[in-house]
Amino acid sequence: MPTINQLIRKKRQSGATRKKSPALQKSPQKRGVCLQVKTKTPKKPNSALRKVAWVRLSNGQEVIAYIGGEGHNLQEHSIVLVQGGRVKDLPGVRYHIVRGALDCAAVKNRKQSRSRYGAKRPK
């Protein structure tokens, strides 16, 4: 416990804040290549098979990215756009793949929240 004089001489240092998406290196998105596409099971109490992809980014770093929406066309060697955003029930998944960009197709027959899934406006 410091004395008052010690605190006057040198203020308390705040701890360094941890970055939420360090692999993007302050970019909004980064391009990457899918190394493998798999499913992961969420932690308790949820139950599902969530689609994820191991991606090597253009800066050489490898991350696990979540593939949102129903159905996808991704496979090994697909070029994808990755943005930040974690998946709460999948430990270690801190990135999302942008649907409708590069090799990742948009979600078909999507009526609501279309911009998140790259779907065009229905006629």
Swiss-Prot record:
Basic residues bias locations: 8-21
Record bears the keyword Transferase: no
Top-level lineage group: Bacteria
InterPro entries: NA-bd_OB-fold (IPR012340), Ribosomal_uS12 (IPR006032), Ribosomal_uS12_bac (IPR005679)
Ranges where the record places region Disordered: 1-45
Keywords of this entry: Ribonucleoprotein, Ribosomal protein, RNA-binding, rRNA-binding, tRNA-binding
Gene Ontology BP terms: translation
Pfam families: Ribosom_S12_S23
Functional summary from the UniProt entry: With S4 and S5 plays an important role in translational accuracy.
Family in the record: Belongs to the universal ribosomal protein uS12 family.
Name of the protein this chain belongs to: Small ribosomal subunit protein uS12
Upper lineage: Bacteria, Pseudomonadati, Chlamydiota, Chlamydiia, Chlamydiales
